[in-house]
Amino acid sequence: MLDKLGQNLSEALNKIKNATFVDKKLVKEVIKDIQKALIQSDVNVKLVFNMSKEIERKAIEEAPPKGLSKKEHIVKIVYDELVNLLGETTQKLELDPSKKSVILLIGIQGSGKTTSAAKLARYIQKKGLRPGLIAADVYRPAAYQQLKQLSEKINVPLFGDETRTKTPVEITKEGMEKLKKVDVIIIDTAGRHKEEEGLLAEMREMKDLTNPTEIILVIDGTLGQQAKNQAKAFKESVSEIGSILVTKLDGSAKGGGALSAVAEINAPIKFIGTGEGVDNLEQFDPKKFISRILGMGDLDSLLEKTEDIMDESTEESIDSILKGKFTLIELYAQLETISKMGPMKQILSMIPGMGGNLPKEAAQLTEDKLKRYKIMMDSMTMEEKENPELIKASRLQRIAKGAGVKQEEIKDLLKYYSTTKNAFGNLKRGKMPKMGGQMGQIMRQLMYKD
């Protein structure tokens, strides 16, 4: 898992951060730990050793810039070299809203291409454009049905042939006509092996027909450094590959290897799949990615996620909080918002100091606790939600029984409510809660049992 890589790298860097004195011996020891962490994540050994030499050279020879301590300088060197390993710069998907764009998705069978087509449609939808999908994979029996279910979930038009009697080229040609009103057409092509010349020829025919704005190669993140050969083969067959989307990074022990391998052949990685949900697709930014796995956070992405799930009820709740009203009704709305943002592990990794060494159990406990808190509040009357101070012995007993929990858990919820209310009170008065203060207390109450 990538969180294992992050944990190992963070532990290595902590040796530098916690040291009273940094010498050559410590630098070499930390570099060995970094090498081990990267090789375990299936990063190419040659790449790892070349990077290690650079880290060692800079850490020993370079003087820290003004304003940075020796320890901070070494941590920055490691961070910069890890970013370089993954491609250094961010490559964005450029779409012109004034004209129709066509995206052709290619890749071998089992890479997660069909799911990625829906995720990409959702991503484009959130950017304010109208996407449409074409199911051009007639070789895999469940491909059309899978894309149909996903497209209905995100309310995106789909064209395909459920009978599978038409050729992919015929389906694509008809689909281009039917989806005239959309801004971006995403075509899910048949999964193919890099050696299947017939299918590659068909893909080239579809490329000539659609004149795509971008061809995106979908690669399975569980392949590790083998991803390099796959990307290279497709790039040689279809030289116009515009970018790469790496899937299944949330559950892969070889994710680091896949990313570094693809970056090595100078094929820009534009997207990464970080979960099974249609919203679990992210624009790939090497700097943000490394920041998160090292536990440094990614507040920009966290804010983007928050904006994506903001709805009218959430805005009303925030408006009430800013006016000084914070009851269990507002707390419930906040927990609903957090639940919509995605896996708790992913959210917490975006908060500085909360990623890297975060135990998996803590993230799971947080997610479970959120669900239990909502169940408890569902067992309360409106009067109790508006006036939590009314919840005394008899009411406590009734609510606990209705929610199927112990009375101590209701008390735990009320304690969490009180802490959160105080934090929002400070926010209203212009004091930003710090991770080490009240905000840290809020997160600890959610993450750990008392």
UniProtKB/Swiss-Prot annotation:
Which PROSITE patterns does the protein's record reference? SRP54
Give the UniProt record's GO annotations in the biological process aspect.
SRP-dependent cotranslational protein targeting to membrane
The keyword Secreted belongs to this UniProt entry's keyword annotation: no
Provide the reaction this enzyme catalyses. GTP + H2O = GDP + phosphate + H(+)
Location within or outside the cell:
Cytoplasm
Per the UniProt entry, the Enzyme Commission number(s) are 3.6.5.4
* Keywords associated with the record: Cytoplasm, GTP-binding, Hydrolase, Nucleotide-binding, Ribonucleoprotein, RNA-binding, Signal recognition particle
Per the record, the domain comment is: Composed of three domains: the N-terminal N domain, which is responsible for interactions with the ribosome, the central G domain, which binds GTP, and the C-terminal M domain, which binds the RNA and the signal sequence of the RNC.
What is this protein for, i.e. what is its function?
Involved in targeting and insertion of nascent membrane proteins into the cytoplasmic membrane. Binds to the hydrophobic signal sequence of the ribosome-nascent chain (RNC) as it emerges from the ribosomes. The SRP-RNC complex is then targeted to the cytoplasmic membrane where it interacts with the SRP receptor FtsY.
Q: Which family does it belong to?
A: Belongs to the GTP-binding SRP family. SRP54 subfamily.
Q: What is this protein called?
A: Signal recognition particle 54 kDa protein
Protein source organism = Methanococcus maripaludis (strain C7 / ATCC BAA-1331)
